[in-house]
């Protein structure tokens, strides 16, 4: 495993914040580099987060902006399943994602407080949680998700919330699930929850208007 200057990583969603509010959130966590993981670095409803405008604004505040939507974006054609939906587990093994890991090695060594940025306010509804942050959490990083109210939540806490959400859904359909799945390990539960999350939020090729 690579050893970095910092093993901390943040994520954030720009949502409909003003640039000033977005800056406040970043500064609260001493962020010095924003890695944009949107496939399309634009927003129809929040033009302040177009790539050029955001890059210029952050540079003026002493924060580095890096676009990595090609490597870490959700809208990818290199890892589709048979239904035309992106498979996050396949995505991690693609050349583009692996190139992103290589690029991130330098970023994580050059900066102390790096955040991945996408559009959704809630990390649980975004691929930054289910794809990119999942990878770094599994590789020993302390991943924290910055929320719109200025608080943050650990990746592991969100994983527990996700597992509980899907287990509750299963129990509503099949109340005897505890007896039937007595050997259903925590690792299996987590992996299955990630797959269900993938099905819920993963990009489909017919959704051409999708921005992430």
Listing of model-derived features with the role each one plays in the protein:
Residues 2-212:
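Residues lining hydrophobic/aromatic ligand-binding pockets adjacent to catalytic sites
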């Amino acid at each position: 495993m690579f050893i970095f200057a910092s093993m901390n990583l943040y994520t954030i969603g720009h949502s409909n914040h003003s640039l000033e509010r977005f800056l406040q959130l970043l500064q609260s966590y001493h962020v010095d580099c924003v890695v944009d993981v949107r496939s399309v670095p634009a927003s129809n409803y929040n033009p302040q987060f177009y790539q050029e405008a955001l890059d210029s604004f952050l540079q003026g505040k002493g924060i580095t902006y890096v676009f990595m939507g090609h490597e870490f974006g959700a809208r990818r054609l290199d890892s589709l399943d048979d239904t035309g939906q992106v498979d996050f587990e396949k995505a991690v093994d693609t050349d583009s994602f692996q190139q992103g890991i290589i690029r991130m090695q330098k970023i994580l060594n050059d900066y102390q407080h790096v955040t991945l940025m996408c559009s959704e306010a809630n990390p649980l509804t975004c691929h930054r949680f289910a794809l990119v942050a999942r990878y770094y959490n599994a590789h020993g990083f302390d991943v924290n998700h910055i929320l719109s109210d200025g608080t943050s939540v650990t990746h592991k806490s969100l994983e527990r919330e996700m597992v509980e959400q899907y287990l509750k859904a299963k129990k509503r359909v099949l109340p005897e699930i505890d007896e039937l799945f007595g050997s259903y390990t925590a690792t299996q539960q987590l992996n299955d929850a990630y797959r269900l999350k993938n099905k819920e939020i993963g990009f489909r090729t017919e959704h051409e208007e999708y921005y992430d």
